[in-house]
Amino acid sequence: MVSLDLEARLPAEADDRLRGRLLHHGKALVGTAGIRPGDRVLEIGCGTGHLAEFVARIVGPQGRVVGLDPRTVAIDIARRRTLPNFTACVGTADDLYLLENASFDVVLMNSMFHWIQNQEQSLAEAARVLRQGGRIGISALAKKPPHTWQVLFDEVFRSAGLGDSAGRPWISAYRLDSDELSHLLAKVGFQATSVGLRPFVDYFADVGEVIDFEFSALNSLGNSTGNFFAGLPAEKRAKVRAALAHELIAYDTPSGIRLDRHMIFALARKLWG
C-alpha cells in the first residue's frame, strides 16, 4: 500500500541512505571507466562518499581518490570513511582551478552533470586536471525520455491546481542528449569512446522515500528547495501530498513503488586540453 508518511528526514542522513541507490549506476560507471589499482581518481559531486569509498578499494594503497562536494555536512559524513587513500573536500566543479594540471588518471561525475550550469567550462577544467590519455566517466539525467517521476510530478501538480512541474527547481535546465554531450566533450579535447542511454529501475517503500530520493540531488547541491513542499502553503502541500499518493498507486508493486530512470552514460579520453 502507498503510504502518506512524509515525515521530514535530516537532509544529510537522507542523502547518505538514498545515495546508496545511486551506487549501482555509479558502479556501472566505474566499470565503464576501467579504473585500475594505482589510479588517481577525482569524483566531482561525491556526496557522502559511497562511490568514492568503492573506488578507493579498487585503486588500493598505490592509488588515491579525491572527492568534492559543495555541502560541508555531506563531506563530514564522507570523512568518516577512514580509508587512507581517500580525501574528501568541500568544493564544486567550479573549484577545479585549485587542483594541479595532469594530476589525475580518471574523473568521475556520477548523476550530477545535469545540475552544472557552465558545463563546457567544467569539462575543460576536468581535461586540464587529467593526464594525457586520462578518462572521464559521466552519468547524467537524460533530456529524453523523461524519468517516470517527471511525468508523475507533472500530473501531480496539474491535479493539485499548480500547473505542471516545468520550470520547477528540480527539473534541471541543463539536461543533454547523447549528441549534445558528445559535442561538448569533443569541444574541450576529449574523444568519446561510448555515449548512450541506460535504463534503471528503483523500488520505494512509501511516498516519503520517493520524495527523499528525487530531491536528494538538490540537497546535495545545497539547494534549500530540495524539499519542494517548503515553499507551498499548508493547503497546497496537503493537495500535492494527496495527489502524489493517488498517482503512485498505479506504480505500486509487490516489490514496492516502481519508478524508472533514464541516464546518459559517457566515457571519453583526453586528447588535448
What are the residue ranges of the model-derived segments?
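Conserved class I S-adenosyl-L-methionine
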Residues: M1-D39, H50-F54, A74-I77, R81, ...
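Conserved Class I S-adenosyl-L-methionine
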Residues: L4, L22, T48-H50, Y174-G273
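Class I SAM-dependent methyltransferase SAM/SAH-binding core
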Residues: L42-I44, T48-L96
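Short, conserved SAM-binding segment of the class I
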Residues: F54, Q121-A126
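Short glycine-dipeptide loop
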Residues: P61-Q62, L130-I136
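A short acidic, Gly/Pro-enriched loop at the edge of an enzyme's catalytic core
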Residues: D94-V107
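A short SAM/SAH-binding and catalytic strip from SAM-dependent methyltransferases
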Residues: V106-Q119, A142
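Conserved catalytic/acceptor-binding region of the Class I
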Residues: E120, R135-A205
